[in-house]
Amino acid sequence: KLIRFGIIQYICRKHFIMGKLYLIPNLLGETAIGGVIPEDVVHIIKNIKVFATENVKNTRRYLKKIEKSINIDELTFLDLNEHSDIKDIETYVPYLADQDVGIISEAGCPGIADPGAELVALAHKHNYQVIPLVGPSSILLALIASGANGQNFSFNGYLPVTRPERIKALKVFEKQSAVENRTQLFIETPYRNLQLFEDIISALSPTTRLTIACDITTENEYIKTMSIKDWKHVKPDINKRPAIFVLYARSF
């Protein structure tokens, strides 16, 4: 297989027909395509026939929303999720020898808090062009809407599931934020949002700022920054809704 791939790659490069790897943004929720996905990006998506995707069903639905006339049955879908083995991902690289491939995650931009990095690294290794496309990223949008430091920040993914470990992690983030003037971003499984919120307001300093950015880009978007002290008087409606939490250990 590797020898065959090498021959195909050589022929395609000789005739300048190498594919490109496109990092394709997905919607963050129920939003009109035209509101968040540029027309140029839509045009590129419509011409791709192979997709490495986190969730095939979700991707099929997204592509139909992009363009109803797309023939889904003519497309190739490659699984690219937390269960994908690197050996399986390596078998996707030959598709790039003579055609473009797109990576699509379930929501937002692939490669950040979502699968995609391994295939991107392999594309670079084999000298294929990697092209990130413009679209919504909940992490970036939450950060710029928070009022926190955008020069020094960390995205920490999911916090520990057990409460003692979660509170310990929160205090570490708060200390780092205070000492290094660093903004800390993290997420939680939507049905545990309120548990995380309660831990934040009970364990952290009253002057630390907390931003909750929920359902970003949708009609139900909710973005609010307040001190922990002020959050104690509010119960945000964030249960089972996708949210980004932003901590910044600076008072207003």
Q: What would you call each of these model-derived segments?
A:
Residues 79-84, 159:
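Conserved helicase motor
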Residues 19-22, 100, 179-252:
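A contiguous loop/helix-start segment that scaffolds small-molecule binding in enzyme catalytic cores
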Residues 17-80:
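Glycine-rich, flexible N-terminal cofactor/catalytic loop recognition
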Residues 1-17:
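Short, Lys/Arg-enriched N-terminal segments with co-localized hydrophobic residues
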Residues 90-125:
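Glycine/small-residue-rich loop that forms an oxyanion/phosphate-binding "nest" at active or ligand-binding sites
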Residues 28-30, 106-110, 190-192, 250-251:
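Short glycine-rich anion-binding loops that position phosphate/pyrophosphate groups of nucleotides
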Residues 45-51, 128-131, 183-184:
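Short active-site oxyanion
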Residues 22, 118-176:
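Class I SAM-dependent methyltransferase SAM-binding "motif I" and its flanking Rossmann-like core
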